[in-house]
Each structure stands twice: as C-alpha cells, then as structure tokens.
C-alpha cells in the first residue's frame, strides 16, 4: 500500500509535489520523506516495479509524479468496485490548515499526524482486490486531465472524481463544473487550441443511451439513422416530441401505449429481469467491468436501471480512453475534456489522420459519432472528415 502526501492541500496535482510517501506491506510501515520539516529529507524515488501489487490511495494524483506501472491499482476504486466501504474521515488538522490557506500545508503538518491518517487507510487495505476497474479509471481519466484546457491566459486543469453512485465522474475544480459548461453564456469561448493554426474537435455519440440499451437487449439500430429519429418514426411523432417520449420511457418506466414497440418491450423485460435478480441476490454487477451494486432500500427498478446504464456508458468510455492513450502516430494532438457522451480534442493543423483513428476507435461495435470543429469551444460547427 502506498499513501502519497502531496505538499499542497488545495492546488491541482500538476502544480504541487510529493511531500512524503508512507509505504506498507500490511505489517511494516515505512515513511519516506522528501519535503516535510519534521525529518531528514531524501531525493531518490521509490522503484515500484519490483512489487507484485501496489495499491495507491489517490492513484490519479500520484500518477502526476510517478509513471504508471502495470502493477498499480487505486485502493479506493478497488473497494468501490467490490461495493465495500472506502470512506475515511479526514483528520481535523487538515481542515485547520485548509482554513489557513497554507500553500505548503503537508510539509508543515507533523509526521505523526500524517501517520494517524495513514492508519485509517491501512485498516481497509486488507479488503483490496485486483481489478481492471481500479486501474483503468484513474489511469485513463488522469491522462485526459494532464493534457489541460488551453486559454489565452494559459492552461486550466479539470479534476475528475469517479467515486460517485454510478461511477460517472463529476468534474469540478476551483468552482468550475467542467462536466456542465453552459453553451449559451460564452463561458466556453476561452478554450482554444494550444497549437498554431490548431482547432478543437469534438466527437459526440449519436443517441448514446439508446444505442447502449439496444446492445444490452439485442436490438439492432441502423447505423445510417439517428437513434432518436429511428424511434420517432415508430411513434409517428416529430423529433422534439419524440425525444420527450423516449426519455420518459427510458428513465421513468415504459408506458402501456408504447409497449408494442420492440425496443421498449425488450427494455422493460430487461429492467424487470434485472430487478428480480437484484432482489434475489441482493446485488448486481455492471455489464463490462463487473462492479458490484449492492441492495439499497432507496433503489427501485428504474433507478437501478439508470445506475447500470450510466455505469455501462462510463465503463465503455474508460476502455475507449485507454485505447486512445495507446495511439502512436507521433501525434501532438490530445483529448482535453471527457463529458459522458462526447470527447473534446485539441488537434494540430496537420493531424487529421489522428482524428480519423480516434473516430474509428470510438465508433467500434456500432456507435456512430458526429464531429464538430471550431477555433474555440464556443463556436463549433458540424463537419465530416
């Protein structure tokens, strides 16, 4: 187990350093000091490749300062994947130093106080288990985070938090919700390309939830038709009215008058079957990465379905981000913002081939995308490549 202590309590991980590490095999604990004033300091980094498994508290932040290795897993995400408790209360001293806005708080907080906090994490370390989930989430989201969003004032950095009810990450930092930037107030206009003559490219999945559900229930939606239009034609309604009907069926339960439509009948059957399994087994697992969702009296069958659907969306996207991170075209272009059913890229002027490769990866297995391009994030125009 590795417990990294960053120098700053408030700065983004890219703008701080590792103050110290506490490392434990469950029996022996080792404090490695780089910047804390309480002890002798060293310079050497720890070599983690010799360990079989390395569970890190806050792996996404840790990877700003250490290279990823295949033996690394996030402790909290490992417990979350198993539906086990991963909550550790922060000690009061950290709250005190936050209020003081001390820029190097963790260099000043006594070592024994850090060790007290570490002990609370150590108590739950024994429940950790290897999973792709606890490795790919912090690795993939951290990779996008590091790329930053470029503005005329420099870079802004997002902060993804996947420890939510559905594993769909929130993304708020310094008061800005990057997962829900408004389209009509000009706030997006500050985000531009970092490259000379570069542009921003955004790929949006068409009717993402509809197509994800279709995969779950074995219904084929034509790739050359928009998913919402495909359903609208079955209602005999215009698109705007049809969308409202669709959302009502998917998130509130299928109404009798739409039960004759195969897509909704099979969706309803899937929801009911999953709910019975949930009641019988007191848990279900997500379709791709097998994360457990335990019984909760506050859940009903439609809420459970929404949790599973959002988890499916996120898990597929995490696998996509992992594949994108392995593209090797000697490109400079990078993904800079992930927002559930779309990914925004900063693309160098000579790298259209990169976007073509990205599009191919994102569309695999029948998930068509739409492409928008712009000089800034507020002025994006649909295009074809």
Q: What are the roles of these predicted feature ranges?
A:
Residues 52, 70, 198, 333-334, ...:
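A structural micro-motif
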Residues 150-152, 256-259, 287, 335, ...:
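Extended hydrophobic-aromatic, low-complexity segments
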Residues 63-147, 182-301:
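Helical catalytic core of nucleic-acid polymerases
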Residues 369-385:
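Short proline/glycine- and acidic-rich turn/helix-capping motifs at secondary-structure junctions
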Residues 133-137, 248-249, 264, 336-343, ...:
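A glycine-rich phosphate-binding loop feature that marks nucleotide/adenosyl-phosphate handling sites
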Residues 46-61, 204, 256, 334-337, ...:
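Short glycine-rich phosphate-binding loop at a beta-alpha junction
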């Amino acid at each position: 187990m590795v417990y990294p202590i960053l120098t700053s309590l408030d700065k983004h991980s890219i703008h701080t350093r590792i103050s110290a590490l506490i490392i434990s095999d469950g029996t022996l604990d080792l404090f490695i000091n780089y910047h804390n004033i309480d002890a002798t300091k060293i310079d050497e980094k720890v070599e983690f490749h010799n360990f079989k498994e390395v569970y890190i508290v806050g792996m996404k932040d840790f990877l700003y300062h250490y290279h990823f290795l295949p033996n690394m897993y996030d402790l909290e995400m490992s417990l979350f994947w198993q539906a086990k408790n991963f909550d550790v209360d922060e000690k009061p001293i950290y709250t005190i130093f936050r209020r003081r806005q001390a820029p190097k708080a963790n260099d000043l907080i006594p070592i024994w106080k850090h060790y007290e906090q570490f002990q609370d994490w150590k108590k739950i370390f024994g429940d950790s288990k290897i999973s792709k989930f606890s490795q790919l989430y912090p690795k993939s989201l951290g990779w996008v985070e590091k790329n930053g969003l470029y503005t005329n004032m420099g870079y802004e950095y997002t902060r993804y938090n996947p420890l939510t009810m559905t594993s769909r990450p929130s993304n708020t930092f310094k008061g800005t919700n990057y997962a829900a930037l408004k389209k009509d107030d000009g706030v997006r206009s500050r985000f531009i390309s970092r490259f000379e003559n570069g542009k921003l490219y955004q790929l949006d999945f068409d009717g993402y939830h509809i197509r994800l559900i279709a995969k779950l229930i074995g219904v084929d939606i034509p790739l050359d038709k928009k998913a919402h239009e495909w359903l609208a034609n079955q209602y005999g309604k215009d698109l705007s009215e049809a969308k409202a009907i669709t959302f009502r069926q998917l998130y509130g339960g299928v109404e009798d008058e739409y039960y004759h439509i195969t897509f909704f009948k099979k969706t309803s059957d899937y929801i009911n079957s999953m709910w019975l399994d949930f009641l019988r087994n007191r848990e279900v697992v997500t379709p791709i990465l097998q994360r457990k969702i335990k019984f909760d009296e506050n859940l009903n069958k439609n809420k459970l379905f929404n949790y599973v659907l959002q988890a499916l969306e996120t898990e597929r996207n995490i696998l996509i981000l992992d594949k994108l991170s392995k593209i090797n075209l000697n490109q400079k272009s990078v993904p800079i913002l992930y927002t559930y059913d779309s990914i925004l890229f900063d693309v160098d002027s000579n790298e259209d081939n990169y976007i073509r490769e990205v599009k191919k990866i994102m569309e695999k297995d029948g998930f068509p995308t739409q492409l928008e391009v712009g000089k800034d994030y507020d002025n994006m125009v649909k295009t074809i490549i």
